[in-house]
A protein has these predicted regions:
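N-terminal interaction modules that seed assembly of large macromolecular complexes
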Residues: 46-108, 112-115
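Alpha-helix boundary/N-cap detector
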Residues: 35-38, 42, 61, 137-140, ...
């Protein structure tokens, strides 16, 4: 025989039901599980040993065509698919995007500056770093982004229309922020 529910407890499907006793969050013996730090691709460790000026503690924007340069230099020691995966992780990292957003020149394998970052690539990096930081910040970082877009526009040497055409994207909030920066 099934025993009836005790009168002091509410059924589980009742949205107003609360468990008796302290909540899990209030229990002092409960600890949040720690997530291990994200591991980077093992090949990035080797690239940091081979090219510390590019992949070490301080990241620098990579020149266009660096994949081909790395394959030419180390094709016998690394698999093409591994290099693609490692560079994809590297160039999408917040640290790398911050280096691009800083306005540094692109660098070759010798660590020498070889070309400027294109204005639209700099703008993309600024916006992506902003989005990632804004997601973690309680304060509005849009004014800081607007100032950085103003500086990037001035450094580009382009006219307002040319710059706006290059950097216009699908996000209307970012487009409005960019327009405000160009009018300042």
């Amino acid at each position: 025989m099934i025993s009836p529910l005790p009168t002091d407890r509410l059924p589980m499907n009742d949205p107003t039901a609360r468990p008796a006793g302290p909540s899990r969050a209030a229990r002092p013996d409960r600890r949040k599980p720690t997530t291990p730090p994200a591991r980077q691709h093992p090949l990035l460790d080797r690239l940091a040993q081979w090219y510390p000026a590019l992949f070490g503690d301080t990241l620098r924007p990579l020149k266009r065509g660096v994949f081909q340069d790395l394959m030419a230099a180390h094709g016998d020691a690394i698999a093409e698919v591994d290099l693609k995966a490692a560079l994809a992780l590297h160039t999408r990292s917040t640290r790398y995007l911050s280096a691009v957003a800083s306005g540094q020149a692109r660098h070759d394998l010798a660590g020498q500056p070889v070309e400027d970052v294109a204005p639209e690539q700099l703008h993309h990096a600024l916006v992506e770093v902003f989005r990632r930081r804004q997601a973690r910040s309680p304060q509005d970082l849009a004014p800081q982004l607007q100032q950085r877009i103003e500086r990037a526009f001035e450094a580009s040497g382009l006219g307002r229309e040319a710059y706006a055409t290059l950097v216009r994207g699908k996000d209307e909030k970012i487009n409005a922020l960019t327009e405000a920066a160009l009018e300042a």
